[in-house]
Amino acid sequence: MLHFHAPENWINDPNGFIFYNQQYHLFSQYFPYGKRWGTMHWRHAVSEDLVCWKDLGIALFPSRPEDQNGVFSGSAIEKDGKLHLFYTGVQYQDFAENNIHKNGPKGFLSWQLALTSPDGYTFDNFDGKKVVVPLSTDPEIYDPQHTRDPKVWKSEHGYTMVLGSTVQKQGRLLFFVSEDLEHWTLKNIFQKEGLGWMFECPDLFEVDGQHVLLFSPEGTGPYGFDKNQAYIALADFDPSDCALDLPKPVEPIDWGMELYAPQSNIDSNGRRTVMIWLRMPSDFAAEKWIGLYTYPRVLNIENGNPKWSVHPNVLKRFSQKAEFGRLDPNAPFRMQTTLKKGETMNAFGLKIGFDGTALYTDRSAIITTPGLSPAAYVPCEGQEVKLDLFGDKYVFELFVNEGQQVLTQYVNGFENAVDSIPSQAVLTTTEEC
């Protein structure tokens, strides 16, 4: 596969994504003992181009009381040539029955910690960790259990950290500020009704003159694998006092409803680049690993709307022309075409149709997971729709109308079947890393 995944076991959220010392660094929420969620570690990989990754094994692991039951999600930032990692550490109050890798009904406690690496390769898990945001002592400000996922960035006003939290079953964002990355002060709080009971993995940044919030609120579904989904919102944000407002409705980051926990940073050319976790069925048995990330996506704002594209480093690999009927359907492929109103097609087992108001997909021929809906749709109107379809063994990413919307979903594998493919369709492929 060309998509990022661990060599074995479980991964979920992308963490610590950064271009540092002329390399891309990417960490993953990782469970080293099997293909299921459990005591979280950070697994580390590096890349020169965001496409081919070198696995470096575990970077962060539980080592002190505040993170003894998991090194949860977080982010990375460079300062004075060093790589600073921020994450949530958890301590279980009890355990699930016969499983020390999950908490029991009493839940857990959360701290925010930092670790500084001198070079991006060396991580002192025993003496290098420091608590930077303590356990909450006032649950009316932030919850002692459900406060997590620090994203840290620098602006002209210093350093800012945003955390997801909850109070009285309503999600909120906490904004902390610092001058030195060590001492943090709560600056502001954002809360809005109707967006779920807990905000996970917040990511706030400016692109094309517009502030954007990516976040994963819990309790907004149910859709797909989970009732928790990833969303995007155009935001009004004042970095001087961290005042945030979301004047427009939030939208799904992806219409496949199977992505979660996006994390962004700036690539080597200044593009806002996003990595996103694709959730996979728990019974996935075809590989030693479970969990993968989308191709890195570039986010822009055009005419006041988000626009997504596959990163240019990925696109330039798809230079080998291929023929329908002769291509191995489980090799990485890209198909570019246009569907007119009323047309349908079958692309390697994925059925796609357009009725003038929405684009529909049907993956029933290439999934077997019971209870998982085979159908999905993207709202779009017109007489025709432009499609850019990327397939890679266990996943398809469908970019609609040049990235105005995207639909990404898991599949068991593609078929040789093709039918009613428009004559102008262009099919290309590439080698794996």
What are the residue ranges of the model-derived segments?
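Repeated scaffold domains used in trafficking and secretory/extracellular systems
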Residues: 197-202, 259-262
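Beta-rich carbohydrate-recognition and catalytic domains
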Residues: 1-149, 154-195, 208-255, 278-319, ...
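Beta-rich accessory regions
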Residues: 234-433
